[in-house]
Amino acid sequence: MARKGSSIRLSSSRISTLLLFMFATFASFYVAGRLWQESQTRVHLINELDRVTGQGKSAISVDDTLKIIACREQKKTLAALEMELSSARQEGFVSKSPKLADGTETKKRPLVVIGIMTSLGNKKKRDAVRQAWMGTGASLKKLESEKGVIARFVIGRSANKGDSMDKSIDTENSQTDDFIILDDVVEAPEEASKKVKLFFAYAADRWDAQFYAKAIDNIYVNIDALGTTLAAHLENPRAYIGCMKSGEVFSEPNHKWYEPEWWKFGDKKAYFRHAYGEMYVITHALARFVSINRDILHSYAHDDVSTGSWFVGLDVKHVDEGKFCCSAWSSEAICAGV
């Protein structure tokens, strides 16, 4: 009986050993498999990183690799957001509320800001404009509050800054308070395009208006006709409105309308369609576009050509409005030469 019991115990011990051996073997295969998978993942990530970066440097840890990949994804997201912001800027969105000179926010959105281009020696013309349609003092404020029309003379500085001509403008402005003085512009024909560009930029930054108009100081503006015409274009976010024209580009240096960059307009030397420079209007979004891109917008010899060139490659509605042809006066005309 003792021999039989001893045999049973020996058999049971062998079975336990066999089971333990099998379990250990399976565990070894499992651990080896997991280690193999992790090593393969590590190798794949390293190879992928080398492929993307073009570098065959020594392997880095998986954690560092994942951090690099996550960082790149964040950069892609940031780039996408920057593109959306750029697009929003081109649409005319602004991130701040426009304010008046005293720091208070505007309550009613102006219809249009009119910049009247004037020169240092043109006081008589300015006085004629004030008397004819612009007004001064209380009447100028009434034009803003009741009609939503802000009118300002736009002028640069003398080539000799601080001279008697500059002081004369400062004195006049202290009496009338109806100037936009652009300190970065020298009053000279060759800076006319820069003057218009900086006016649009300044006005768009200061006033949140529906429209912005460029005019000259020897025309009469029919405010009621202007308001009626602009009201018809309130739903168009990118409109360029004026008396449209095109014509010959003059390459002769002695010609009145000489264009130094005439060769850019092709063999036929013809301008693209653009508005006469006496008066034209652009919408808020286009004025914001000029403001944002003021440093890279090219200027030609003539300001009306320059303005047209800024919009020729954009999705802009060109409105050929005969009422802006100031030389053809009628009862419905918006402007007329004086």
Curated annotation (Swiss-Prot):
Give the main EC class.
transferase
Which Pfam families does its entry note? DUF4094, Galactosyl_T
Q: Which cofactor does it need?
A: Mn(2+)
Q: Which residues form a coiled coil?
A: none
Keywords linked to the UniProt accession:
Glycosyltransferase, Golgi apparatus, Manganese, Membrane, Signal-anchor, Transferase, Transmembrane, Transmembrane helix
Give the EC number.
2.4.1.-
Per the UniProt record, the lineage of the source organism begins with: Eukaryota, Viridiplantae, Streptophyta, Embryophyta, Tracheophyta
Which BP terms does GO give this entry?
arabinogalactan protein metabolic process; protein O-linked glycosylation via hydroxyproline
Tissue note? Expressed in roots, rosette leaves, cauline leaves, stems, flowers and siliques.
Q: Report membrane topology.
A: Single-pass type II membrane protein
| Lumenal compartment segments | 33-338
Q: InterPro entries attached here?
A: DUF4094 (IPR025298), Glyco_trans_31 (IPR002659)
Q: Which residues lie on this side of the membrane: Cytoplasmic?
A: 1-12
**Protein name stated in the entry:** Hydroxyproline O-galactosyltransferase HPGT1
